[in-house]
């Protein structure tokens, strides 16, 4: 474990490393960050990793946290002329990776933004300006020239619903954003010392990936259909190169153990809405500690059939309060109605406030399930101040 002397503050720093042919990692090193969302205390800071691939065309994979804005943009412009950027690949839209998308669009107005359908929809609502876009599906490819043919892997719920992986056939690098990462900040670009990293690797899995074990297994199955993977370029922490087989094997083992649990709890939340996603992760992490499997689903993008299927296999339900008005209210309320219709009196239920001003009353939502005969798993969770 990297220890920081008491009272000593490390700066936000940048690191650029050529990790393969015409491929550069831009790593934003956040030495002192001690918390990542509510449930995720950090001992060793974190990094936000971004990548440039230069073929005949140039692609940038992910950006950085907005706290690195000027440092990151200065570093990027030292590597390339942003106006020459052809593609911006958004692995997912969580702000720590997409926080500078607007800045990239300002520097490179002709860039094409590449992402899943859900990611592009989210960016349209966030950016509020027209931009060139390319929606990709599983198995789609993008040829940058000079052998850099990118193949996209859809990996929803790792750990956001819009996640994609990107595989470069020439360098055999798989870019996975959050998956297979860890919150660990030091100057080593790669996973040179497994013993030093494995505690943080497991803790990261438990907090973020364990609640989505079945999604992990689905992603691993899709990864197995790719050619050889020599490096996994993660969004946080060191890149995996020396221990790719070992560490992906651990993900498989842990996820299979989690998926075999006899009891499943379904956790329904709303991404980018109040504290819904953060609280749902904290609750899900706590549930997995008891040996119970968790399946998480985002009400913003939930398909009614998928909602029904998940409710039908779950012994317990946890739901964050949805909005009663606004852009996503209708879809979220439809999902809630589907949950209510599919739920049965043998199930337990818990509800929590999302912390947004326009959200439904937590008591009103709880009463709807109580009227159906479901047993409260815990008292409604109220938010009286910013969760920490």
Regions found by a protein language model. Name each.
Residues 7, 11, 17-21, 115-163, ...:
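Metallo-beta-lactamase
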Residues 16-78, 165-168, 172-175, 276:
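Conserved beta-strand hairpin/beta-sheet module of binuclear metal-dependent hydrolase folds
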Residues 52, 165-203, 209-231, 241-269:
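Metal-dependent phosphodiesterase/nuclease catalytic metal-binding core
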Residues 56, 67-114:
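Active-site metal-binding motif and surrounding structural segment of the metallo-beta-lactamase
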Residues 61-63, 85-93, 113-116, 174-177, ...:
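Active-site neighborhood of phospho(di)ester-bond hydrolases with catalytic His/Asp-centered motifs
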Residues 100, 302-307:
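Short acidic active-site motifs
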Residues 184-190, 196-232, 237-239, 282-297, ...:
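FMN-binding flavodoxin-like domain, especially the glycine-rich phosphate-binding loop
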Residues 268-290:
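Short, charged N-terminal beta->alpha structural module
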């Amino acid at each position: 474990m990297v220890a920081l002397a008491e009272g000593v503050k490390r700066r936000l720093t940048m690191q650029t490393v050529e990790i393969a042919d015409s491929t550069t990692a831009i790593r934003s090193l956040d030495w002192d960050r001690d918390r990542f969302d509510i449930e995720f205390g950090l001992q060793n800071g974190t990094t936000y990793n971004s990548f440039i691939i230069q073929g005949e065309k140039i692609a940038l994979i992910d950006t950085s946290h907005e706290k690195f804005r000027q440092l990151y943009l200065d570093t990027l412009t030292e590597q390339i002329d942003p106006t020459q950027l052809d593609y911006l690949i958004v692995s997912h839209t969580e702000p720590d990776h997409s926080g500078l998308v607007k800045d990239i669009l300002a520097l490179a107005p002709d860039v094409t933004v590449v992402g899943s359908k859900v990611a592009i929809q989210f960016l349209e609502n966030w950016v509020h300006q027209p931009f060139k876009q390319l929606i990709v599906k599983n198995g789609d490819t993008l040829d940058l020239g000079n052998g850099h043919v990118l193949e996209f892997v859809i990996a929803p719920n790792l750990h956001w619903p819009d996640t994609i992986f990107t595989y470069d056939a020439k360098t055999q690098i798989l870019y996975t954003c959050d998956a297979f990462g860890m919150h660990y900040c030091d100057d080593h670009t790669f996973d040179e010392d497994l013993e030093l990293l494995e505690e943080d690797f497991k803790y990261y899995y438990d907090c973020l990936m364990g609640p989505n074990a079945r999604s992990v297994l689905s992603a691993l199955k899709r990864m197995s259909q790719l050619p050889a993977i020599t490096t996994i370029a993660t969004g946080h922490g060191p890149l995996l190169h020396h221990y790719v087989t070992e560490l992906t094997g651990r993900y498989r083992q842990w996820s299979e153990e989690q998926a075999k649990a006899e009891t499943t709890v379904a956790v329904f939340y709303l991404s980018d809405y109040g504290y819904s996603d953060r609280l749902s992760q904290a609750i899900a992490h706590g549930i997995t500690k008891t040996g119970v499997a968790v399946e998480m689903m985002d009400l913003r993008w939930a398909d009614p059939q998928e909602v029904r299927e998940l409710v039908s296999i779950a012994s317990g339900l946890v739901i964050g309060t949805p909005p009663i008005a606004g852009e996503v209210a209708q879809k979220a309320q439809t999902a809630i109605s589907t949950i209510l219709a599919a739920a049965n009196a043998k199930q337990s239920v818990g509800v929590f406030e999302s912390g947004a001003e326009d959200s439904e009353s937590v008591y009103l939502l709880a009463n709807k399930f109580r009227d159906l005969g479901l047993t409260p798993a815990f008292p409604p969770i109220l938010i009286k101040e910013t969760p920490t």
